[in-house]
Regions:
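Serine/threonine-rich low-complexity intrinsically disordered regions
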Residues: 8-10, 93, 138
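Context-gated lysine
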Residues: 2, 12, 86-87, 118-121, ...
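Internal mixed beta-strand/loop scaffold within catalytic domains of large alpha/beta enzymes
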Residues: 53-126
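Generic alpha-helical propensity signal that fires on short helical segments
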Residues: 36, 114-118, 144
């Protein structure tokens, strides 16, 4: 099976950006595994939308259960270049979920995406949050307006 990527130049550029970020994060998380965990790396799993015809993605999943309770760094690109009924041209995204076993380390969720309509109008969305398991009042004061 083979993934077919979106045809538009901006979707291709967005995919290159989020794939670069994905590898950056996976390399850093693997370095943490080597230093503090079981030295196991994140495993890559590829998936396909409609058999790859409308894209798909690559997910790196944590395999070290001494450091990460749950972890994945996902890149996906779904497109409908061949479907005149759809207004969406493509959606390209990096989504990350990292939950540590250490309760003093906050969980991290991040989503960076490029969405492009067939009218060629597109937009970036970026969101992230840190979710501490144990309250730290001085840190709360730093992040609260």
């Amino acid at each position: 099976m083979k993934r077919i990527f979106a045809a538009s130049a901006t979707a291709k550029e967005a995919n290159a950006i989020v794939e670069h970020l994905q590898l950056y994060f996976v390399e850093r998380l693997n370095a943490l595994n080597r230093e503090f965990g079981e030295t196991r790396t994140f495993d890559a799993v590829e998936w396909y939308r409609d058999g790859g015809r409308h894209g798909g993605g690559l997910r790196y999943m944590a395999t070290d259960d001494s450091l990460f309770n749950r972890g994945s760094v996902n890149v996906s690109q779904v497109h409908y270049d061949d479907d005149a009924e759809k207004k969406l041209g493509s959606a390209t995204a990096l989504s990350t979920i990292i939950h540590s076993f250490n309760p003093l380390v906050p969980s991290i969720h991040m989503h960076i995406s490029w969405t492009e309509m067939k009218s060629t109008k597109g937009y970036w969305r970026i969101m992230a949050d840190l979710n501490p398991a144990i309250e730290n009042k001085s840190a709360t004061q730093q992040f609260t307006a």
